[in-house]
């Protein structure tokens, strides 16, 4: 079995947000196909990993530029006879390249966004420097795993990486079929009781970590644009906003409910009638949209909020609206509440972790096999 060393230089266990889930669940399912050893930070609860971990990295920000880790990681690679070194994002790429030169190990970059573009959309002046560095690391890697076809196509065109050395390993979900109608009814009853929502009101949902600027901007659009448009068309609804970072918000519209961080977000996905996703900026696939669709929940989204998700495998559950047409957005929300479509099996074949990691492991296992004369 091929041995992969995964460098994960930040806390991700327990996995509370989409980015953390993307790392935790990819590695958990990937470890069913390869022998995986995670080199992680000391703050993680590594008992939750499901594979061997080594808490090597400190909490200091200097860990990203600390050359003293190189020797220790090289020792681990030689001891474990590893064939591949995988990094999350490009930030430790410089270190990984030195390690590959010293050990001969092959390098995988597990990309979650085109990072430079993500920082460009959030107004960081130094995004171009990151763009040059990110492209360099991807070109030097033996393989790059991208979160979406859009990211992979961008890297091929602008970073000039090899098509043969890249593949899409998207964000996934653990279940392979939607919840039953009975499960959804029970969830809806519980959530409506908790938040005092009447059966006559449509339950609309948005989820995010609101300290992240694109998510906070989306919340402001819901508060200032979408809810007034829903009120104008006379829709009866409650807009549930789940996630941390809005503790100081006190919206004047009684239809908006700030639920804050919730222990079981899947209960809310099952309970809702429509998932609303007016995200305008930020890179990568929107994990909350994948989770919503996987719960057979109708989604109304902007184009940016649906990047990486093929409408053709969503069975009519995904509606995409042009940015800034919030009156049409509100109309589509109302239309989605009367839809009777169901998420098809093709969606789960694309977004289930078992399928995603099996495809990635096939590349690694093939690379790890010795050449035959």
Predicted feature locations:
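N-terminal subdomain of nucleotide-sugar transferases
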Residues: 1-46, 80
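Active-site proximal beta-strand in glycosyltransferases
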Residues: 5, 100-119
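Conserved catalytic-core segment of nucleotide-activated headgroup transferases in glycan assembly
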Residues: 22-23, 28, 173-252, 258, ...
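Membrane-proximal helix-turn-helix segments that form the acceptor-binding/catalytic region
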Residues: 71-75, 101, 125-147
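Carbohydrate-associated surface elements
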Residues: 150, 169-172
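Acidic donor-binding loop of glycosyltransferase active sites
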Residues: 267-284, 297
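Short hydrophobic beta-strand element within catalytic cores of glycosyltransferases
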Residues: 288-291, 298-303
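A charged, aromatic-enriched C-terminal amphipathic alpha-helix characteristic of glycosyltransferases
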Residues: 338-367
């Amino acid at each position: 079995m091929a041995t992969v060393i995964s460098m994960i230089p930040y806390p991700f266990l327990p996995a509370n947000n989409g980015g953390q889930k993307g790392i935790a669940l990819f590695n958990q399912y990937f470890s069913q196909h390869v022998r995986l050893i995670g080199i992680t930070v000391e703050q993680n609860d590594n008992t939750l990993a499901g594979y061997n971990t080594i808490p090597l990295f400190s909490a200091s920000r200097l860990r990203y530029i600390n050359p003293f880790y190189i020797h220790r990681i090289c020792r681990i690679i030689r001891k474990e006879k590893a064939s591949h070194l995988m990094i999350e994002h490009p930030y430790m790429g410089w270190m990984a390249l030195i390690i590959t030169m010293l050990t001969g190990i092959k390098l995988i970059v597990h990309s979650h966004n085109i990072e430079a573009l993500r920082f460009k959309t959030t107004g960081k002046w130094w995004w171009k420097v990151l763009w040059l560095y990110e492209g360099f690391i991807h070109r030097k890697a033996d393989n790059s795993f991208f979160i979406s076809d859009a990211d992979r196509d961008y890297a091929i065109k602008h970073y000039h990486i090899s098509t043969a050395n890249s593949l899409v390993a998207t964000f996934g979900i653990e279940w392979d079929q939607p919840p039953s109608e009975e499960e959804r009814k029970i969830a809806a009853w519980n959530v409506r009781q908790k938040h005092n929502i009447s059966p006559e009101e449509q339950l609309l949902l948005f989820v995010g970590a609101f300290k992240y600027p694109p998510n906070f901007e989306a919340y402001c659009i819901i508060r200032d644009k979408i809810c007034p448009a829903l009120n104008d068309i006379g829709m009866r609804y409650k807009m549930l906003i789940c996630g941390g970072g809005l503790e100081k918000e006190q919206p004047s519209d009684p239809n908006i409910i700030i639920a804050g961080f919730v222990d079981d977000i899947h209960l809310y996905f099952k309970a809702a009638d429509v998932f609303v996703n007016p995200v305008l900026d930020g890179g990568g696939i929107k994990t909350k949209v994948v989770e919503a669709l996987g719960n057979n929940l109708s989604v109304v989204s902007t184009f940016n909020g649906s990047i990486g998700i093929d409408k053709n495998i969503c069975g009519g559950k995904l509606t995409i609206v042009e940015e800034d047409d919030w009156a049409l957005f509100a109309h589509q929300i109302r239309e989605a509440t009367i839809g009777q479509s169901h998420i098809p099996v093709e969606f789960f074949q694309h977004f289930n972790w078992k399928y995603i990691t099996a495809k990635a492991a096939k590349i690694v296992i093939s690379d790890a096999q010795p050449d035959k004369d």
